[in-house]
Amino acid sequence: MALGLMCQFLEPRVKRDGSVVYENVIDEKLLQLGAYKNGKYSTERILETYRYNVKEILRTIPYLVRENIKSFRLSSTIFPLYEFCGDIARGDGIIQQDLAEAGRIFREHGIRVTTHPGQFCVISSDKENVIENSIRELEYHAYLFDAMGFDRTPFYAINIHGGKGNRSEKLIETYNYLPENVKSRLTLENDEKCYNVKQLLAISERIGVPVVFDSHHYNFGVDDLPFDVAFRETLATWGSVKPLQHISNTEIGMENAAYNQKRAHSEMIRYIPPLQLEAIRGNLVDVDVEAKLKNIALLKMREDFQIAN
């Protein structure tokens, strides 16, 4: 079993008034599209940013090892503006060397690595430019995993939502067009807005893509399969690869709030569906812990639910 950490690692800092705040120790640098288009970034500045962010991956790994965290979701913005400046990353020997070293260390410590491209990655869109941009984003994540030496299997998942609803034929068409290093790692996650588990299973049956079961999204879905059926059948889509799932909760006190407030991730995990908890304890799945307090929530979840490292 692995509980997965999402992109950040928080450490406590005591303020002058004695209160405690949590700060992310992963210091990723960003670049702004507007500034780039206005010519404010030199090639040297972009390269410096890319090299720095890759070094941050290497600096993150000891924190994961310290807490015995065996699954980690990489940020999607290690190479900001990659769609415009990807050649700078791909052509730099230092970046390639550091990515290869990071991949080697992740594998040495048995840490699963995944990514989750953002909400604008929509391979079922009715706009061709959106699909083209989405494919470029997926190719970026695949390049990253290739450079780290990761196998081309969904164990190293590039996980997305289905995107625009009622467009399953377009989703399948785009999937079949994807390059092999993307397609072999791609997974689809259920949500309450566009594609529920039942719909994703129908897609998976046709193209073989694994389904990431998100129990929180499932709770807000409509016209879906019973929980036990959805849970069991999503596991079956993974074949011989260990399934990846997600867990998150509604924040305490928000149970009767507006819809979007109920959907938002809580700071900590206070409830796990019994079937999912059984699978976690039985080492049948890896589960990304989608909570605002990141590793703090992950470690507390281990303790509260008696989950072995």
Where are these regions (language model features)?
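Short linear capping/connector segments at secondary-structure termini
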Residues: 118-120, 160
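Conserved, mostly hydrophobic/aromatic
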Residues: 116, 214, 287
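Short, glycine/acidic-enriched loop or turn micro-motifs at the edges of active sites
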Residues: 119, 192, 217
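Betabetaalpha-Me/HNH-type nuclease active-site subdomain
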Residues: 189-190, 205
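Short acidic, Gly/Ser-rich segments with clustered Asp/Glu that frequently serve as metal-coordination loops
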Residues: 195-196, 216-222
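Loop-centered beta-sheet repeat module
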Residues: 157, 162-171
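Alpha/beta catalytic barrel-like cores
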Residues: 1-112, 121-124, 129-134, 141-143, ...
